[in-house]
């Protein structure tokens, strides 16, 4: 998830598609009356079959505009290694793009967009503005994989959701982002520590850390809201959907829900007992993270699965970075301990007016093959939406192994929320979170500040609201 403006790091490119769409993006200008609902009759066509469900033409080329961010573009090039096994001579020509909207908006207006677009990055095109110009992708999930399995059956639950707008599934989000709490397996084993499953256990661990001259947590000023994510994840597990929906819909008193308050009170206790590395609110976030990953002065750190790649140059040798789900407030939560926040990101779209939309869909089918998905995980150290493509050793990445295990253990108990991104609340929320973690604001003050931020958006009639149910 994106946490700070002006950044093209892994979090930026994984941010949920709905964020840009809901904010009334400038991309509405992409729509034109002449192009709306008009599918291209030109371009190569092939005969539909089990191996060619979309009728992509043999020996044709797919123009793909791919966001050149943290994942690069080579993983889409890799599709060429498998495409030919299904449609003879079909090739994808990848064009790396950083500024998606500025470069591709004119092509939508002109009626000649690329065949496939990775609509990611800081300049992502708003989906609502081009919704009628995009192919729906339900038939992709009904098609078979290159291994002969129905695609809908081999992906994680809920992966359609972030790519569905006004009941139209138009964006395939390819990468799974897993959120959890991270620790050094080596350090824990050396000290006989057990990763906490409840907040009470985390408090006990904090006391053990102090005996060793260490801290439980650390935070950096730009990433103080990672603890907001941890708070919300734990609160949703404790209180269930009513907590998630109240926050998503900016309801009055949403931050005062008992489950939310229960976690805030424990966090407040941890701050008062000096279980956070001091000075975090004045420390650049990667330097703060290095205090955990390299100096090992802190035991735990809440983050998304990007953390290993982000800190690979500042992680102690044999750290064995491992993730666990967020802690539960009690031993009888609404959702089990294994439940976690995970979301599909990196949205791919197929414009109707591309020269080869059938080929664009076929490239996506190729990317969902076991071979292509495994290649992505091996080279990018991140899971795709395709289940079962990461080996037991995680290609040597303990973080990747733990992400896969967490997803498998969660089963259908996977949730997500988007209100922070949808309404651009992170910058405002950073202020009270930094004050709270520094000990300058108590739990009551944090609650009041967060509620005021939600209330301001809810009561602003100029802001389009997204009703979540």
From Swiss-Prot:
Compartment(s) where it occurs, according to its Swiss-Prot or TrEMBL record:
Cell membrane
- Fetch the Pfam families from UniProt: SBP_bac_1 (PF01547)
Does this UniProt record's set of keywords contain Signal? yes
Q: How is it modified after translation?
A: Predicted to be exported by the Tat system. The position of the signal peptide cleavage has not been experimentally proven.
Q: Summarize induction of expression.
A: Constitutively expressed. Slightly induced by GlcNAc, (GlcNAc)2 and chitin. Repressed by DasR.
List keywords of the entry alphabetically.
Cell membrane, Membrane, Signal, Sugar transport, Transport
Q: Where is the signal peptide?
A: 1-37
| Outcome of gene disruption | Disruption of the gene delays (GlcNAc)2 consumption, but does not affect GlcNAc consumption ability. Deletion reduces the level of chitinase activity induced in the presence of (GlcNAc)2.
Q: Where is the composition biased (Basic and acidic residues)?
A: 35-48
GO CC annotations, alphabetized: plasma membrane
Chain intervals for the UniProt region annotation (Disordered): 30-54
Q: Which family does it belong to?
A: Belongs to the bacterial solute-binding protein 1 family.
User: What does the subunit comment say?
Assistant: The complex is composed of two ATP-binding proteins (MsiK), two transmembrane proteins (NgcF and NgcG) and a solute-binding protein (NgcE).
| NCBIfam families in UniProt | chitin_NgcE
The protein's job, in short, is: Part of the ABC transporter complex NgcEFG-MsiK involved in N,N'-diacetylchitobiose ((GlcNAc)2) uptake. Binds (GlcNAc)2. Can also bind GlcNAc.
Query: What name has this protein been given in UniProt?
Result: Diacetylchitobiose binding protein NgcE
Q: Source taxonomy lineage?
A: Bacteria, Bacillati, Actinomycetota, Actinomycetes, Kitasatosporales
């Amino acid at each position: 998830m994106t946490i700070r403006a002006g950044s093209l790091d892994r979090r930026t490119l994984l941010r949920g598609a709905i964020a840009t769409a809901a904010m009334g993006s400038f991309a509405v200008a992409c729509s034109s009356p002449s192009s709306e609902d008009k599918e291209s009759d030109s371009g190569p066509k092939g005969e539909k079959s089990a191996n060619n469900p979309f009728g992509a033409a043999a020996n044709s080329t797919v123009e793909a505009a791919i966001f050149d961010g943290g994942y690069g573009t080579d993983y889409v090039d890799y599709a060429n290694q498998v495409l030919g096994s299904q449609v003879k001579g079909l090739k994808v020509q990848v064009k790396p793009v950083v500024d998606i909207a500025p470069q591709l908006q004119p092509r939508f207006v002109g009626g000649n967009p690329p065949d496939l677009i990775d609509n990611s990055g800081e300049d992502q095109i708003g989906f609502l503005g081009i919704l009628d110009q995009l192919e729906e992708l339900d038939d992709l999930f009904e098609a078979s994989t290159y291994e002969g399995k129905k695609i809908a059956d081999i992906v994680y639950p809920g992966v359609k959701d972030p790519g569905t707008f006004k009941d139209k599934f138009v964006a395939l989000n390819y990468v799974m982002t897993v959120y959890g709490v991270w620790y050094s397996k080596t350090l824990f084993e050396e000290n006989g520590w057990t990763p906490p499953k409840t907040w009470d256990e985390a408090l006990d661990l904090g006391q053990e850390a102090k005996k060793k001259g260490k801290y439980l947590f650390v935070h950096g000023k730009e990433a103080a809201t990672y603890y907001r994510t941890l708070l919300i994840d734990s609160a949703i597990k404790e209180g269930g959907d009513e907590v998630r929906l109240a926050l998503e819909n900016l309801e009055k008193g949403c931050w005062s829900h008992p489950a939310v308050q229960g976690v805030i009170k424990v966090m407040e206790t941890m701050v008062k007992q000096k279980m956070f590395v001091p000075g975090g609110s004045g420390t650049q976030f990667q330097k703060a993270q290095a205090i955990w990953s390299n100096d090992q002065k802190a035991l735990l750190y809440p983050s998304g699965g990007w953390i290993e790649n982000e800190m690979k140059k500042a992680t102690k040798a044999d750290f064995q970075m491992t993730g666990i789900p967020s802690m539960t407030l009690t031993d009888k939560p609404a959702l089990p301990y294994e439940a976690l926040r995970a979301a599909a990101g990196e949205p791919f779209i197929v414009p109707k007016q591309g020269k080869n939309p059938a080929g664009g869909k076929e490239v996506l089918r190729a990317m969902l093959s076991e071979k292509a998905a495994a290649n992505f995980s091996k080279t990018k150290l991140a899971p795709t939406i395709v289940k079962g493509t990461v080996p037991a050793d995680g290609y040597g990445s303990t973080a990747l192994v733990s992400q896969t295990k967490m997803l498998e253990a969660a089963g259908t108990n996977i949730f997500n929320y988007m209100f922070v991104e949808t309404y651009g609340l992170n910058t405002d929320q950073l202020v009270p979170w930094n004050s709270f973690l520094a000990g300058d604001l108590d739990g009551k003050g944090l609650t009041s500040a967060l509620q005021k931020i939600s209330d301001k958006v809810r009561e602003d009639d100029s802001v389009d609201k997204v009703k979540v149910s």
